[in-house]
Amino acid sequence: KKFFNKTSFGSILLKPTIIYVKPLLKIIESINLKALAHITGGGIAENLSRVLPNNLGAVLSSKELDFEKNNSIYKWLNYECKVDTKEMLKTFNCGIGMIIVVSKKDLEQTIALCKTIKQPVKYLGKITNSKKEVVFN
């Protein structure tokens, strides 16, 4: 209960998945996307590296991930079940279901558009010249 406040564990597990098709279609109409990564099994690093060219990687902020926040199944797994943070990042999406890669010049417009269409959005980090390496700081 201390991780979920008044929400039951069952309710959290039964929360429906987000369907991204409609919001992504609206974003694609307005923004020149560089890549999309649907974060599924394999976690953030594996799924993001799949959509990046061989000469690019990424540096992401772990502070934006749900296992750092309250009311999170990921925080519960991390702390109560003692799942190591590195293992969390390799295995789970940690609350990030989709990553949109855009050029720096399109960043603010992308964030504004996501807010307009009521799609939660977080700035996770930046693309680097690190040859498919995705790291968290």
Q: Over which residues does each language-model region extend?
A:
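Glycine-/charge-enriched secondary-structure boundary and capping motifs
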Residues: 2-137
